[in-house]
Amino acid sequence: MSPFQETFMRKFPCELGKIVVLGLVAASLVISFSGCLPMIDRFLYVMKGSEIPAPYNKLTNKRVAIVCVSDASAYGPDNLSDSVTRLVGAALLAKVKKIQLVSRTEVDKWVDENGWDNMDYISLGKGVKADRVIAIELSGYSIHEGKTLHKGKANVVMTVYELDHAKGPVVGHTYQLKEYEFPKNGRPAIQSTDRQFEEFFLARLCRLLSHQFVKHDRFDSFADEAILGM
């Protein structure tokens, strides 16, 4: 740094900070109107940092069973429930240290033998020798808004049961997504197939669910909107 720059920094530190912040804000506004959301994401990353801690962090060194029940699950396992279980499980394996997931085969076998309707999650956990059960109840699921738009919709209630608690099985954590929709204004169905959009929506939904257990980037939503061209 030159002598002039050092003198300027000593005399005008606050003014310089304001100039930098205002400059970044102005640049962000200009870029947002041009549709370059990834660039905004980078500005925000530099200004604020990236990670938010997990609300629930008691899965380390635990044997965890994940079960998802949808509107169709009363008749047995379905593709939607299977996809949600798989995606959430993959996120936990990637980010939670020393977690052990009960295999889906083992969970499905227990549920097949004991019934899919009115499931008892604590009994399930005991049956598969789990320390934790993550129960995901999914309803109102859809990926369409009329005949011309794709819009993902879902209601989710997620509950964590702690079976190894000193006082016996307890509810350790709950999380709800009520009438969750993405993208907010929909997306023309002509721009992607049903399968392509559903894969993207489920990945986003399950990432939101996994954020309850793993630290995550505070600006994930910007990236998703940019990918969809919002």
Give the location of each predicted region.
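A mature extracytoplasmic/lumenal domain signature
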Residues: C68-S70, T105-E106, E137-G140, M158-E162, ...
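C-terminal/domain-edge helix-coil "capping" segments
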Residues: C36-N61, L163-M230
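N-terminal segment of the mature soluble domain
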Residues: R63-A135, V170, E199, R204-F213, ...
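Bacterial N-terminal signal peptides that target proteins for export
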Residues: F4-G23
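Alpha-helix termination/capping residues and helix-transition junctions
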Residues: V30, K58, G127-A130
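Bacterial N-terminal signal peptides
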Residues: V20-S32
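Surface-exposed short loop/turn segments
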Residues: N114-V170, K184-N185
